[in-house]
Amino acid sequence: MGSQNRPPPPRKRQPPPPEDHLVTYKRRRSKETQPLPLMANGANSKKDAKAQHWISWRDTLHGFLQSPAISQGGGIQTCIRHALQHNPCLLTNGVVVHTEFKGNPAHSQGEEAKVQHPNGAAGGKVVSADAAIQDAAAAASSEANKAMCNNALFDILVSQKFALLCHLLLGTFHVNKPGDVIDLEKIDAKMRNGDYAHNPALFDDDIQQMWEKFEQVGQEMTGLASNLSTISRVSYQKQASGFSEAEVAEHRIEEISLPGAVHVVTKESTTTVQLAPCDSSHSTIPKRTVPPGRDLCPCDGCGTKVDVEEGLICDECDTMYHFACVKLLNPDIKQVPAIWHCSTCSFKKKELAADTTNNVAHDCLHGGNCVLCDQLELVKTEEEDPKLPIKIELAEEREGSSVSSMGEDNEPDLSTTALSNLCKHCGTCEDDDKRFMVCGHPYCVYKFYHIRCLKTSQLAIEQQKKLGCWYCPSCLCRGCFQDKDDDQIVMCDGCDEGYHIYCMRPARNTIPKGKWYCTFCKIRRAAEGMHKYEDSVLKIHGNSKHACNVNQSKDSEGDGTEK
């Protein structure tokens, strides 16, 4: 009985199982690495810019996981999940923790060892064992290639530059689905199909193509933004100044020819600039004065008007550009240069310096490229009185002048400038530093042109390299630059440039009757016609207003006498 009342012995306390320790370790590890609350706190404070772009990065990766293609698994889904588990906000020393994606090489090696040591297998199975070894080696190589591509993609996803790109798309451009812009579905599909496992170089090509697309879009956006900025500024100035489109079209015409007179019009400016005349003659070409209130020139780059204060003028041809347009083409230009030449004149100088044509001879002291000598040739002259009659003084032929000699039987009816050995455009003779280009057509009526008086399109050096000689704009079609069908070439009655009837716009089947004008001269004539119409309207309005004033004065006098 006593033994029955005896209390049971105390049980020994069992130690906790090792599984509890592992659970506690996992729970403690989970508590130490909580990237999302840290990033959320940074976003709420709005003081840590780094946390801002990492939040955009997190949202972008979550968007990738929600994509129907990537959510299938087997592709880059595992890599994205590992990137999300990585906490870039805790990196202080710039050390990136790499996650190694490996296949199961130990398992492969075990299988290989098992095949190599069959332990009692028959000798007839040696051939199948070798095939199994090769398959295992190929599988191991594929797994290694796939792991290498995953590691490379992981490094890209956890980089700060990628996070900044995500923040640019989400925070700046407010792209709802960055996955539509950053196209990873193609890479995911190839990763799932095993293309990268067989050829890992394809992964690098696809990644580079994606970034090159971003670079191209960025460059296009930069160029469009610069152009739109220039157009916006010029459009506002145009609306504020009140100039019409007809005036802009008139200013865009670089060369103009009126019936009975031939002259060159540079970009209009308030100062008339003339080449220094030679000793034997002076220019017989009348100057075109700038009408009052039209001292604004169009930019040769964008075609809109530009004020003299904000423009950049070529020191060779007086062509005006917006400084912003010049800076867009030449980003190295930071401020307005003291001496500047446009691209056309720069190309012309290079062509002259390279002696690309046999008709051009460089025997001047400085080789024809001295900017100072070019500047000294430009002299300011007073505007000629338009009421004075135009007189043509024939220049004496100087020694050494490059004049084409023809037989008397075949001599055509030359123009006054050709008979006087004068330039067709400026009406002055040839000089050491103003050399002639001589038209090689035997029936050319103009013959002589100063090189500096011709535009690059009129010289057409590249188009005439294969021809035996140089043809002027009147003797060679300006549409096709082909030395053929001279009987079908028609010269414009405004600028004397020649065109084949099938090169006209629109093309013709027969030679037009009466006068014919090219496209540029049609625009110029339309602008001149509008100006004449405006002047006639103002004249009629002025006369009627004057008549009304006279009638009102007579009525007031009559009322006074009656009183």
Swiss-Prot record:
It is found in: Nucleus. InterPro entries: Znf_FYVE_PHD, Znf_PHD, Znf_PHD-finger, Znf_RING/FYVE/PHD. Disulfide bonds: none annotated. PANTHER family: OS02G0192300 PROTEIN (PTHR47162), PHD FINGER PROTEIN EHD3-LIKE (PTHR47162:SF9). Disruption phenotype: Late-flowering phenotype under short day (SD) and natural day (ND) conditions. Extreme late-flowering phenotype under long day (LD) conditions. GO terms for molecular function: chromatin binding; DNA binding; histone acetyltransferase activity; transcription coregulator activity; zinc ion binding. GO terms for cellular component: chromatin; nucleus. It comes from Oryza sativa subsp. japonica. Interacts with TRX1. A zinc finger (PHD-type) spans 296-348, 420-472, 474-524. The keyword Transcription applies. It comes from the Eukaryota. This is PHD finger protein EHD3. Residues 1-46 are annotated as: Disordered. GO terms for biological process: flower development; regulation of long-day photoperiodism, flowering; regulation of transcription by RNA polymerase II.
